[in-house]
């Protein structure tokens, strides 16, 4: 029997990481950017507290979640959640069931991320879309292992290759700032994030979301399961 404490309780508790409006904004942005249709069936792998998943549902998608923690059911009991350890088990859904598979800050937590990526491919329908966010090792290497649960870092190149090896097509990987104003006005604010990243001392990160998320850059990958799989 596993007597370890729930990772959400330790790392993502509301004292250290209060609930905010950001997850709903992120879900809405991704729905708009990738033209995800209302009524599409989405699976979030590693949904944590369920905030982004709830954002997708509120945006009109049919959302399901899977995680090692039952925390989503505490915050959003109406959301269908399946609890399992994906380091050891398959995603507990049938082949080709979902139009969209989404994950954020997930694949870096696995010693063998190729296994979970293969499972994401399996549960996507042909033509379905994968969206995955993970820290950019090139700019986060100093802080990456501050999270004890991090296992495998990714660069844009290694993330792209992982998806291509697992038969995804139309693979795109780009740097992504977790700042909604940058999504809305990239030509104005993207250069300012770069200036902040290079000039602001790290000691100020806890005191400014702008400084923190100018420095803590994510990789955003999108990919498609081909209509005819090999």
List the model feature ranges, each with a label.
Residues 105-109:
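A short His-aromatic
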Residues 10-25, 51, 83, 111-123, ...:
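S-adenosyl-L-methionine-dependent methyltransferase catalytic module, highlighting the catalytic core
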Residues 1-94, 100-104, 117, 176, ...:
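Conserved N-terminal segment of class I S-adenosyl-L-methionine
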């Amino acid at each position: 029997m596993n007597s370890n404490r729930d990772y959400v309780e330790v790392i993502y508790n509301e004292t250290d990481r209060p609930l905010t409006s950001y997850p709903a904004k992120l879900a809405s942005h991704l729905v708009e950017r990738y033209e995800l249709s209302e009524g599409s069936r989405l699976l979030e792998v590693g949904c944590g507290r369920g905030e982004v998943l709830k954002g997708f549902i509120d945006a009109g998608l049919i959302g399901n979640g899977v995680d090692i923690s039952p925390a989503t059911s505490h915050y959003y009991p109406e959301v269908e959640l399946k609890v399992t350890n994906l380091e050891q088990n398959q995603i507990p859904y049938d082949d080709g069931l979902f139009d969209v598979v989404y994950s954020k800050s997930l694949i870096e937590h696995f010693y063998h991320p190729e296994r979970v990526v293969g499972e994401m491919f399996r549960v996507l329908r042909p033509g379905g879309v994968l969206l995955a966010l993970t820290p950019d090792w090139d700019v986060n290497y100093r802080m990456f292992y501050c999270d004890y649960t991090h296992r495998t870092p990714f660069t844009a190149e290694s993330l792209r290759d992982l998806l291509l090896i697992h038969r995804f097509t139309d693979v795109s990987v780009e740097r992504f700032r977790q700042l909604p104003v940058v999504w809305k006005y990239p030509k104005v604010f993207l250069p300012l994030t770069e200036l902040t990243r290079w000039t602001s001392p790290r000691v100020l990160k806890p005191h400014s979301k702008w400084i923190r998320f100018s420095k803590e850059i994510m990789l955003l990958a999108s990919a498609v399961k081909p209509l005819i799989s090999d």
